[in-house]
Regions:
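Residues at the starts of beta-strands that form the adenosine-phosphate
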Residues: 2-3, 27-29, 95-96, 134
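N-terminal Rossmann NAD(P)H-binding glycine-rich loop of SDR-like oxidoreductase domains
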Residues: 4-24
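NAD(P)H-binding glycine-rich loop region in Rossmannoid oxidoreductase-like domains
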Residues: 4-5, 31, 36-91, 106
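Active-site-lining helix/loop region of Rossmann-like oxidoreductase modules
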Residues: 7-12, 145-147, 152-195
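Residues in the short beta-alpha loop(s) of Rossmann-like NAD(P)-binding domains
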Residues: 10, 35, 103
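Short, well-ordered alpha-helices that flank and scaffold nucleotide-derived cofactor binding pockets
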Residues: 19-23, 27, 87, 130, ...
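Conserved beta-strand segments of alpha/beta enzyme cores
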Residues: 28, 48, 134-136, 187
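Glycine-/Pro-rich loop/turn segments that contact NAD(P) or position catalytic residues
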Residues: 76-157
Length: 195
């Protein structure tokens, strides 16, 4: 049984991943978010809710103690969040990180140049890649709300094979990576629906 810390637990992908973890695995979840009142109907026998901010290093470290996997699905100051996550994981001995980023951070989307808008994603990925963590960075295509699990992955340096992906597909990959922590270690994966 894995103990998983979910940072940004109220995000749309995170909520789908939480449902999948609870239905398909025996994982124990710690749901970390700024406003806990946003989460409803959480199975308290398998999920602990912590109200906190990734900028609060002491609370973040406390939440990481005893965890096997950290899954981060955040928006905001991604560069500082990545620094804090790496520091807190190093301090608590947690090695496995699944971090959601964005397609385009390596100019891997044919015909598209996203420029400086993706700088926070690029910088956070660089911080994680420079760490000694057992990370997997996910770079999803544009999100859809389709109720489907249909995706392919690409490695860093390979062009994307599509432009969209369902949130449910991303959640499925997150659960697979968390349940099989030896998969795709120290990799940055693009994820999209095949076209």
């Amino acid at each position: 049984m894995n103990n998983i810390l979910i940072l940004g637990a109220n995000g749309q992908i995170a909520r789908q991943a939480i449902d999948m973890f609870l239905k398909e695995t025996d994982a124990q979840l710690t749901l970390y978010l700024r406003r806990s009142s946003r989460l409803e109907n959480v199975d308290s026998s398998r999920a602990q809710v912590i109200e906190g901010d990734v900028m609060d290093m002491e609370k973040l470290k406390e939440a990481m103690i005893g965890k096997d996997v950290v899954y981060a699905n955040l928006a905001g100051d991604l560069e500082q969040y990545a620094k804090n996550i790496v520091e807190a994981m190093s301090a608590t001995g947690v090695k496995r990180l699944i971090f959601i980023s964005s397609m385009g951070i390596y100019d891997e989307v044919p015909g598209e140049k996203y420029g400086s808008i993706l700088d926070p994603y690029r910088k956070s990925a660089q911080i994680i890649e420079a760490s000694d963590l057992e990370y997997t960075i996910l770079r999803p295509a544009w999100f859809t709300n389709s109720d489907e699990i249909d995706y392919v992955t690409t490695q860093k340096g390979e062009p994307f094979k599509g432009s969209v992906v369902s949130r449910k597909s991303v959640a499925d990959l997150i659960v697979k990576l968390a349940e099989s922590p030896e998969l795709e270690v120290r990799r940055s994966l693009g994820i999209n629906k095949p076209e």
